[in-house]
């Protein structure tokens, strides 16, 4: 507690006693844990898996006597490309040929056949061309050198020394 009455002071007299208030006492905090509430786990309803049937075997289409025939021809005057091919199949026998113009202007023709008994066979024919292929010489253009440019530079600035005169009074 506190002192009930104030201390009496006399003018000029020393302090007779000092009084201090008693320390404040604190009680320990009361700790109470809040109750923990647990909810029952939610049960998830899962649908039964979908049953899949095994894929049905698909019978591959089989042609016991395959047949085809094709041909193409390229004559490109811009690039000089000249080639042709044709091929025919009847059952297991393939026959065809292709031709092209070689760089020297000759024409190469290949005739071929393929069958289960003889395998693949090719016969190459080479005919002299009507005109040899033009030879294009690639020459680099000469490098042009320019005379070095002369840069005009201004003359350096001249500075005069300061002139000190006598001041008149």
UniProtKB/Swiss-Prot annotation:
Q: Which UniProt keywords apply?
A: Cuticle, Repeat
InterPro entries, per the entry: CHIT_BIND_RR_consensus, Insect_cuticle, Insect_Cuticle_Struc_Prot
| Record keyword Repeat present | yes
Pfam families, A to Z: Chitin_bind_4
Gene Ontology cellular component? extracellular matrix; extracellular space
Annotated ranges, domain Chitin-binding type R&R: 65-135
A single Gene Ontology MF term assigned here is: structural constituent of cuticle
Q: Which PANTHER family match?
A: CUTICULAR PROTEIN 62BB, ISOFORM A, STRUCTURAL CONTITUENT OF CUTICLE
Function according to Swiss-Prot or TrEMBL? Component of the cuticle of migratory locust which contains more than 100 different structural proteins.
Q: What protein is this chain from?
A: Cuticle protein 21
Which organism encodes this protein? Locusta migratoria
Q: What is the lineage of its organism?
A: Eukaryota, Metazoa, Ecdysozoa, Arthropoda, Hexapoda
